């Protein structure tokens, strides 16, 4: 079972294509998207969890292999990857988990809480934008010798799209069409997300320290 963790603020086609490619590469029956509750490493305020959850539900609704989990949102407190994986193991004890995240996030894996346990809980798939250079050696030099199948790096052309760019485009009233599913574009517009001062009520009140993730 694939696990696509991220802030999804907002979710876009890069996330969806990455999940689809990883599912095909590893012949996964299902990919569960897990919007973070309070991402402990984000340096900016993030949109309210319910907004990010609903955008993810809208974006994944048309693919029967995709589902969305609230485990991180409903747990409360800062979101740590090891807690996400432990909860999903408890819910799906017979499934082997493939945790997918940005390759840039993997580069800072040593800063994650409980990083030693992560590779015992899941196989990791690092997805990267075209031109992003990250070799397995960069990570194994920190973690020691990983098992051969513990980590796979996959280049995803659609990850040239970024949530940061989508937020900036929304703030500047530039079009979001074809960067994310139509329903998400409409949700962003209806809820007036990412439009500067007008979206104060749509933001999380938690300010968090420096970060990573998709």
From Swiss-Prot:
Catalysed reaction, written as an equation: nicotinate beta-D-ribonucleotide + ATP + H(+) = deamido-NAD(+) + diphosphate
Organism domain of life: Bacteria
GO BP field: NAD biosynthetic process
Role played: Catalyzes the reversible adenylation of nicotinate mononucleotide (NaMN) to nicotinic acid adenine dinucleotide (NaAD).
EC number: 2.7.7.18
Keywords attached to this entry: ATP-binding, NAD, Nucleotide-binding, Nucleotidyltransferase, Pyridine nucleotide biosynthesis, Transferase
Name of protein: Probable nicotinate-nucleotide adenylyltransferase
SUPFAM superfamilies associated with the record: Nucleotidylyl transferase (SSF52374)
Pathway this chain belongs to: Cofactor biosynthesis; NAD(+) biosynthesis; deamido-NAD(+) from nicotinate D-ribonucleotide: step 1/1
InterPro entries hit by this protein: Cyt_trans-like, NadD/NMNAT, Rossmann-like_a/b/a_fold
Keyword ATP-binding: yes
Gene3D superfamilies found in the cross-reference section: HUPs
Organism: Mycobacterium tuberculosis (strain ATCC 25618 / H37Rv)
């Amino acid at each position: 079972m694939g696990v696509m963790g991220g802030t999804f603020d907002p979710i876009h086609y890069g996330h969806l294509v990455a999940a689809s490619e990883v599912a095909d590469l590893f012949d996964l029956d299902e990919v569960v998207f897990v919007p973070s509750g309070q991402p402990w490493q984000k340096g900016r305020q993030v949109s309210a969890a319910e907004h990010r959850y609903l955008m993810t539900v809208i974006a994944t609704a048309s693919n029967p292999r995709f589902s969305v989990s609230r485990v991180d949102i409903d747990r409360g407190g800062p979101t740590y990857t090891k807690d996400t994986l432990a909860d999903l193991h408890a819910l799906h004890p017979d499934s082997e988990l493939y945790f997918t995240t940005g390759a840039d996030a993997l580069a800072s894996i040593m800063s994650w809480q409980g990083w030693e346990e992560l590779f015992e809980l899941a196989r990791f798939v690092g997805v990267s934008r075209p031109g992003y250079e990250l070799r397995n050696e960069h990570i194994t030099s920190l973690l020691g010798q990983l098992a051969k199948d513990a980590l796979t790096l996959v280049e995803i052309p659609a990850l040239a799209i970024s949530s940061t760019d989508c937020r900036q485009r929304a703030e500047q009233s530039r079009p979001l069409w074809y960067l994310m599913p139509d329903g998400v574009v409409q949700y962003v517009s209806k809820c007036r997300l990412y439009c500067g001062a007008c979206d104060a009520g749509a933001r999380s009140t938690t300010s968090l320290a420096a970060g990573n993730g998709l």
